[in-house]
Structure formats: structure tokens, C-alpha cells
Design a protein with these regions (language model features):
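Short, polar N-cap/turn motifs at the start of nucleic acid-interacting alpha helices
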Residues: 27-28, 102, 121-142
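Active-site/catalytic core of tyrosine-dependent DNA strand-transfer enzymes
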Residues: 54-100
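DNA/chromatin major-groove-contacting recognition/catalytic segments
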Residues: 128, 139-169
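Mobile genetic element proteins and their domesticated derivatives, centered on retroelements
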Residues: 12, 38, 78, 89, ...
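C-terminal catalytic core of tyrosine-transesterase DNA break-rejoin enzymes
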Residues: 6, 107-133
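Short, leucine-enriched amphipathic alpha-helices that occur as contiguous helical runs
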Residues: 1-2, 82, 86, 109-110
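Basic, Lys/Arg- and aromatic-enriched nucleic-acid-binding interface segment
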Residues: 1-15
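Conserved tyrosine-mediated DNA breakage-rejoining catalytic core shared by Y-recombinases
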Residues: 20-63
């Protein structure tokens, strides 16, 4: 599950996109960089074509590869129902004392967009990676994610918990 969350964040994917992936949708090279085919993406369905997300962070690819090695070819990467993912996600937010932050699975895409824009300072890059054709919509995702991040005040306990659990990624 952690590998899918990392992929969703890195690839600025919609929740349904990363939760419905199969191992057959992912191609990684020996350096753990690669491509994810989104056969059922929102815009892909409208346009009648497959959309793609690139994995250019080898740590994301390596974690995804470790999960996929345990799966038969073309098996769903998420082993279990989506409803179970949502429960575990919410339980994780509670364990990290982040329920007041109101994080939801769709926050993963927004956070990824904000991180990408702040890291690279290139709106066109973020729009391309997030697959937005509208600057207006991309800015909503970026600005909203950035505002949430800037307004967030984490307690010492939450920071310590996040640091502790980060070691398991």
C-alpha cells in the first residue's frame, strides 16, 4: 500500500488510478525508472486513449518493484478492496495524529502537484506530469496543496511519529 501511495504522490495520480493498477500496467528498467499505463483514467476515457505517467524517482520505482515481484503477472497491485485501503488510510492518519488536517486519499495528488511545482518551479512540467490541460485547474491543485501545507502545524508527537514510520518506507 505504501508503494501505491508513493506512486500516486510522485505521479500526481487520481486515487482510482493508482488503486486499480495491475502489475501489467507498470514497466520499470534496471534503474527502477519507468512508465505506468493508465488504461482507465478520467481523461483517457473521454479521449479514447491510454494516458501514461512516468516514474523518474528510482526510490519510488524500487519500492513498487519490490511489491510487484511478489505478484503474478497482471495481478492487481492493491491486494484487497478499495474500501479496506480507505480504512487503513484513515487509521494511518489517526495513528499519526493527523485527523485534524483532514487528509483524504485525493490529497495525495494535490500534495504531489504542490511538491513538484515547489521543487522544480516549472508550471508546464507540473501540468504535463499531472496531465492537466488547463492552467487554471493545475493552479487550483498546486495552490490548495501549498496553502494546506503552509497552514499545517504539526505537534512534536506527530513529527516524531512521521519520522519513525518514514524509516519503514
Amino acid at each position: 500500500m505504501a508503494a501505491l501511495i508513493l506512486l500516486g504522490y510522485h505521479g500526481m495520480m487520481r486515487t482510482t488510478e493508482f488503486l486499480t493498477l495491475t502489475s501489467g500496467n507498470v514497466w520499470l528498467d534496471e534503474s527502477y525508472r519507468g512508465v505506468v499505463a493508465l488504461e482507465w483514467s478520467k481523461m483517457g476515457q473521454r479521449r479514447g486513449m491510454t494516458e501514461y505517467v512516468t516514474i523518474d524517482d528510482s526510490s519510488v520505482g524500487a519500492r513498487l518493484s519490490a511489491v510487484m515481484r511478489k505478484l503474478p503477472s497482471d495481478a492487481p497491485i492493491l491486494q484487497g478492496p478499495v474500501v479496506e485501503f480507505r480504512k487503513i488510510f484513515n487509521d494511518g492518519m489517526a495513528a499519526l495524529k493527523l485527523t485534524d488536517a483532514n487528509y483524504r486519499p485525493y490529497s495525495i495528488r494535490r500534495g504531489g502537484a504542490s511538491f513538484d511545482f515547489v521543487s522544480f518551479g516549472d508550471l508546464q512540467r507540473t501540468m504535463s506530469r499531472g496531465r492537466w490541460s488547463s492552467t487554471r485547474v493545475a493552479r487550483i491543485y498546486i495552490v490548495e496543496g501549498w496553502q494546506i501545507l503552509n497552514s499545517l502545524s504539526l505537534s512534536r508527537e506527530t513529527r516524531n511519529l512521521c519520522e519513525y514510520f518514514r524509516s519503514f518506507l
